[in-house]
């Protein structure tokens, strides 16, 4: 892939309580631009925030792009690369015959990834990786901004 056309997407999710108030953050960069996205959801989980971060990031990128997605979530990376085909073949049930959690988001992500050429990269969270650290900051900023806007305390 031509380095000038490379798009890097760094995603992260955070949750204050699990479930609780969640935030997601995305850093997208190529050779010319840098874009940051963030958002929140109430009464959610860290895994939902991890999935939503990737989904929202992909939605902001032109289809047919070549993207390197870096996440610290093995749940997201393994889910989309190893588990999802079995889930679909088993009627959205796990190997233990239980319903797949976050099915709605997995289905949305599965539809989205068909429109891109994606390389998935896992990094250890809070290990100093600049893109991952910034995505983490964005997710936590989103939560802090929600608390500020709604005059609530982060307890």
Predicted segment positions?
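RNase H-like nuclease fold core
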Residues: 1-52, 56-66, 137-148, 152-155
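RNase H catalytic domain
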Residues: 9-21, 55-134, 138, 143
